[in-house]
């Protein structure tokens, strides 16, 4: 059994999703939640909350591997920079505990789950719910975190079949 922590980083809310993968490659939902960072003071205090909150979550759930969504250029450069800072704090929380970090672009996650890189949030939420047999509507950040964990599980399974590491299984010639 392998436990994967998926992280959808954000400067206001960071999505957390944890799944277990059995020997047959089947995914089982363990936990999902938003890590709310608003109301934690200034931006540096929010980053501190993210670092400590993820650390506590890692200590509680003991994942074997971590998958995190890459930064994308969104509405503005300032937003992208804040997202990059939050992502950096999340990665620090992970590597401080000697866990491997695997990174996936949002388009790669959408392609892996829905079959098209331009899928919308509703399609991703729906597919995550189906794949993990979850009832009710998922919040977007939790769905994205679970989606990146599922994507890593698929890449991991493909890598094992091919006898390569996960980076080789996912990389493409440019």
UniProtKB/Swiss-Prot annotation:
Q: Which GO terms describe its biological process?
A: DNA recombination; DNA repair
> What protein name applies here?
Crossover junction endodeoxyribonuclease RuvC
Quote the subunit structure annotation. Answer: Homodimer which binds Holliday junction (HJ) DNA. The HJ becomes 2-fold symmetrical on binding to RuvC with unstacked arms; it has a different conformation from HJ DNA in complex with RuvA. In the full resolvosome a probable DNA-RuvA(4)-RuvB(12)-RuvC(2) complex forms which resolves the HJ.
Question: Where does the UniProt entry say this protein principally localizes?
Answer: cytoplasm
| PANTHER family noted in UniProt | CROSSOVER JUNCTION ENDODEOXYRIBONUCLEASE RUVC (PTHR30194:SF3)
The entry sums up its family as follows: Belongs to the RuvC family.
Q: Which domain of life is it from?
A: Bacteria
SUPFAM superfamilies in the record, alphabetically?
A: Ribonuclease H-like (SSF53098)
State the gene name recorded for this protein: ruvC
- List the catalytic activities from the record: Endonucleolytic cleavage at a junction such as a reciprocal single-stranded crossover between two homologous DNA duplexes (Holliday junction)
Matching entries from Pfam families are given as: RuvC
Chain positions recorded as Mg(2+) 1 binding sites: 8, 141
Organism of provenance:
Xanthomonas oryzae pv. oryzae (strain PXO99A)
Record keywords, A-Z: Cytoplasm, DNA damage, DNA recombination, DNA repair, DNA-binding, Endonuclease, Hydrolase, Magnesium, Metal-binding, Nuclease
Q: What does this protein do?
A: The RuvA-RuvB-RuvC complex processes Holliday junction (HJ) DNA during genetic recombination and DNA repair. Endonuclease that resolves HJ intermediates. Cleaves cruciform DNA by making single-stranded nicks across the HJ at symmetrical positions within the homologous arms, yielding a 5'-phosphate and a 3'-hydroxyl group; requires a central core of homology in the junction. The consensus cleavage sequence is 5'-(A/T)TT(C/G)-3'. Cleavage occurs on the 3'-side of the TT dinucleotide at the point of strand exchange.
């Amino acid at each position: 059994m392998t436990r994967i922590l998926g992280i959808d980083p954000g400067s206001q809310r960071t999505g957390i999703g944890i799944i277990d993968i059995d020997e047959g490659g089947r995914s089982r939902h363990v936990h999902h939640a938003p890590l709310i960072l608003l109301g934690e003071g200034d931006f540096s205090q929010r980053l501190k909350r993210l670092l400590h909150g993820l650390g506590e979550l890692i200590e509680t759930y003991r994942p074997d591997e971590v998958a995190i969504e890459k930064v994308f250029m969104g509405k503005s450069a300032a937003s992208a920079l804040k997202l990059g800072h939050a992502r950096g704090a999340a990665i620090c929380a992970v590597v401080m505990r000697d866990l491997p970090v695997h990174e996936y672009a949002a388009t790669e996650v959408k392609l892996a789950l829905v079959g098209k890189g331009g899928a919308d949030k509703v399609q991703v939420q729906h597919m995550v719910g189906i794949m993990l047999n979850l009832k009710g509507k998922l919040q977007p950040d939790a769905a994205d975190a679970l989606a990146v964990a599922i994507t890593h599980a698929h890449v991991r399974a493909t890598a094992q079949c091919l006898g390569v590491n996960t980076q080789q299984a996912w990389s493409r010639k440019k």
